[in-house]
């Protein structure tokens, strides 16, 4: 199975479908620039620089691809609707993958991207898995930087605010044949975003969900493809009806019956506990076994923790291993479960108060009146210090 999963990570697979090098970028600026939105009214994913709150336009970055011509020159044009043939393969077979990124403003008013090369590399891996064309990452990054520079006035110069970027690649081939697309479109849109926790962090409750399953061995759970997301909406609504804010996606082992933790909603999951075997404090997250999305925030938390916590007086060990629900329940009952939190681009860090698992409610270490534990707060602080340019770091 390892060979099956690892083959999608081979750089050669990504490079194989480079059809041309990018030549140039054409910029057509809008003649009716959109007014800046009220930062208090920003809604994640709904406040776009081209559509909100009026019908004036700003910009979209687009690159087209065909099997005969390869990648076209990049274009930044006034924001407008896409034009797709009703037979476009994306509409029938979900030939689409995407990324979530953010641009920030540093104390000097400069726009900053956080580890964009990691997002573009992941987008290429997703594209290769879906038989979509891959691209030269350095070229797209250059165009993306120019797009952000053009839209940077939409980045609120306020703590916790940013400009959310959505690079999307989709197959546009007008064919209902189930085959490799002969044409595709890569585009980027931007959405101003307020502080996810405008009134301070708020811990959530998760609903442990064994069925339906979000991802399985040999599937596409490790790729950011559109088909992974629509099927999660009904289970999320069911979790909300049961009093939880998100699902905790489980993967059950048929032989042992053990239920393994994978992701929390659309976030990677982290656990802070005292190990039952060593008595040491650990920061644990499930490994990248093909069912877990390799989140950029996840990777950054692991790197920061290893850089600043391991070997420190804190005595925390950073561990990537499978976690079972039985272990979580036992750690909570024995007072060893100190914190649980999710991590992702949109939310950065999201503390978890409890997990509903069957007829059990597993307490995740927070005291009454406490909305976040020390590790959650520390990781959020460290990440945002780098993202907003408040400290020197190689990721800059």
Swiss-Prot record:
N6-(pyridoxal phosphate)lysine carried by residues: 224
GO biological process, one term: L-valine biosynthetic process
Superkingdom of this protein's organism: Eukaryota
Record InterPro entries: Aminotrans_IV (IPR001544), Aminotrans_IV_CS (IPR018300), Aminotransferase-like (IPR036038), B_amino_transII (IPR005786), BCAT-like_C (IPR043132), BCAT-like_N (IPR043131), BCAT_family (IPR033939)
Name of the top EC class for this enzyme: transferase
Gene Ontology MF: a single term: branched-chain-amino-acid transaminase activity
Encoding gene, per UniProt annotation: atnH
Deletion consequences: Eliminates approximately 40% of aspercryptin production.
Pfam families documented for this protein: Aminotran_4 (PF01063)
Lineage, uppermost ranks: Eukaryota, Fungi, Dikarya, Ascomycota, Pezizomycotina
Keywords per UniProt: Amino-acid biosynthesis, Aminotransferase, Branched-chain amino acid biosynthesis, Pyridoxal phosphate, Transferase
Enzyme Commission number(s) from the entry: 2.6.1.-
Pathway: Secondary metabolite biosynthesis
Induction: Expression is positively regulated by the aspercryptin cluser-specific transcription factor atnN.
Function: Branched-chain-amino-acid aminotransferase; part of the gene cluster that mediates the biosynthesis of aspercryptins, linear lipopeptides built from six amino acids including 2 highly unusual and nonproteogenic amino acids, 2-amino-octanoic acid (2aoa) and 2-amino-dodecanol (2adol). The core structure of aspercryptins is as follows: Ser/Ala-Thr-Ile/Val-2aoa-Asn-2adol. The first step of aspercryptin biosynthesis is the generation of the fatty acid precursors, octanoic and dodecanoic acids, by the FAS subunits atnF and atnM.
Ligand binding (pyridoxal 5'-phosphate): 122
Cellular compartments per GO CC: mitochondrion
Identification of the protein by name: Branched-chain-amino-acid aminotransferase atnH
Homology family: Belongs to the class-IV pyridoxal-phosphate-dependent aminotransferase family.
Cofactor(s) required for function per UniProt: pyridoxal 5'-phosphate
């Amino acid at each position: 199975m390892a060979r099956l999963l690892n083959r999608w990570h081979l750089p050669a697979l990504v490079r194989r479908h480079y059809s041309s090098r990018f030549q140039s970028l054409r910029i057509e600026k809008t003649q009716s620039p959109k007014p800046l939105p009220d930062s208090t009214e920003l809604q994640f994913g709904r406040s776009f620089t081209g559509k909100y709150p009026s019908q004036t336009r700003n910009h979209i970055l687009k690159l087209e691809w065909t099997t005969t011509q390869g990648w076209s020159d990049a274009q930044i044009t006034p924001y407008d609707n896409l034009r797709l043939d009703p037979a476009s393969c994306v509409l029938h077979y979900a030939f689409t993958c995407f990324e979530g990124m953010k641009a920030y403003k540093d104390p000097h008013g400069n726009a900053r991207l956080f580890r964009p090369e990691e997002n573009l590399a992941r987008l290429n891996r997703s594209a290769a898995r879906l038989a979509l064309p891959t691209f030269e990452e350095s070229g797209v990054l250059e165009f993306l930087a120019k797009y952000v520079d053009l839209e940077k006035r939409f980045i609120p110069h306020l703590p916790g605010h940013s400009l959310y970027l959505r690079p999307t690649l989709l197959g546009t081939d007008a064919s209902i044949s189930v085959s490799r697309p002969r044409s595709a479109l890569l585009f980027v849109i931007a959405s101003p975003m307020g502080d996810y926790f405008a009134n301070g962090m708020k811990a959530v409750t998760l609903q442990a969900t064994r069925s339906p399953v979000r991802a399985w061995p040999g599937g596409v759970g490790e790729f950011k493809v559109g088909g992974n997301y629509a099927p999660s909406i009904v289970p999320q609504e069911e979790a909300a009806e049961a009093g939880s804010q998100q699902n905790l996606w489980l993967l059950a082992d048929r032989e042992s019956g053990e239920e393994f933790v994978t992701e929390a909603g659309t976030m990677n999951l982290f656990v802070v506990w005292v190990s039952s075997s060593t008595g040491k404090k650990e920061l644990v997250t499930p490994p990248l076994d093909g069912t877990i999305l390799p989140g950029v925030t996840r990777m950054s938390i692991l790197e920061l923790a290893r850089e600043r916590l391991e070997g420190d007086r804190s005595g925390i060990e950073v561990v990537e291993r499978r976690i079972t629900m039985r272990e979580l329940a036992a750690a909570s009952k024995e007072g060893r479960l100190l914190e649980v939190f999710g991590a992702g681009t949109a939310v950065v860090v999201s503390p978890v108060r409890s997990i509903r698992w069957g007829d059990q409610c597993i307490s995740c270490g927070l005291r009454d009146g406490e909305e976040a534990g020390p590790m959650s707060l520390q990781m959020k602080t460290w990440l945002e210090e780098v993202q907003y340019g408040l400290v020197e770091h190689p990721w800059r």
